Structures are given as structure tokens and as C-alpha cells.
């Protein structure tokens, strides 16, 4: 009996150890266990803050109820700031902070949202300075240019509609199999009244294999958008 108890405790401890590695947390995110991934990532300290920010943003975007989305983006912001403090040379940390601020702008007042717009741009530029081939940052920056230009305030921040398509094309060239890039590109094209091109991007996105929970959710979004465009 003691042997089985000891064995059981040993297996439980092994599970705890495995759950508290960056790779294990990343796997949890890929499987859609986002709240658990956030909690486990925080336990990793400096090694887990980027993952905590990612998990929090994903939870807010994919699973959270409307009333709790803002608070989860707050968590993402806090974790991303800690990630930058821990490693100022990590492009992913700046990317996650930009992502959190981009979403938080939807929940904050007008003046604070304007300040966040500058933060999004600056942090994406920092991410790209550290990693010029960061496809996700290119996609986010393309959306930043589109959003501010279409809101009529692009001139205040240096946003330029002419940057939107080139940035998306660069990102897709770097990561042609990434579903979310295609879906976001399609969304931008539709907003620019280039619906035929948007349809092609959505159809391509749906032809790609969904390897993660996020991929599955992004393809669900693609299907819905495709139905609306056709």
C-alpha cells in the first residue's frame, strides 16, 4: 500500500513539475486551457511572463464573457510589463504589451485610448527593431495603420493607409501557413472594399490545417466572415 501511495505522490509531483515549464504552458495555450495556462505561467516568474500575457489576451479574446474581457486584458498588460522588466531585449514582451494595449483601447476613455494608440505603435516598433521578421508585429502594425486612418486620426500618429497591404504581405511571406494572419488580412481588405481579395484570403485560411485551439477559433471566424462576404 505504501508503495502505491509513494508512487502516486511521485507521479503527482512529476505532473506539477511538468506543468511548470514554459513548453508545458505553451502546450496548455495551444490546447485552449487558457486560464490554467495563465496561472501556471505566473508561477514561472521571469520565464513565464510573456506566456502569461499571451494566455490572458487569448482568454479575453476567445473565451471571456464580455464583462470580464477588460480585466483580462489588464492582466495581459501587467504580465507584459513584467516581461519587459525581466528582459528588455525580448521582442515578444513588447508585442504582448502592444496587443494588450490595442485591445484595452476599446475599454478605456477617449483620452486614454489616444495614449494607448501611441503605446501600441511604439511597442510594435520596438518588437520589430529587436526582431525585424516578427510576422505578428507586422500584422498588428498593419491593423494599427488601418484603424487610426479610418477613424480620421491617423495624421496625429503617423498612420498611413499605404502601409497596410505591404505589412500584411510581408507577414504572410514570413509565415504563409499562419491562419490568423490570413483572417486579419481578409478583415482589413474587406474594410478597404477589396472584397474579392478578402474572400481569397479567407478561403486560403480555411484550407490550412488547424493545429491549435486558436487556429480553430480563427477558422470559425473565417467561416462567418466568408458567409457575410458572399
Where are these regions (language model features)?
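Structural register within alpha-helical repeat arrays
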Residues: 24, 52, 57-59, 97, ...
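N-terminal leader/linker segments that initiate helical-solenoid repeat arrays
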Residues: 17-63
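Residue-level recognition of tetratricopeptide repeat
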Residues: 47-48, 90, 134, 178, ...
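Terminal, low-structured helical/coil segments at or just beyond the last alpha-helical repeat
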Residues: 179-184, 188-191, 199-230
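Short coil/turn linking the two alpha-helices of tandem helical-hairpin repeats
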Residues: 58-67, 103-112, 147-156, 191-193, ...
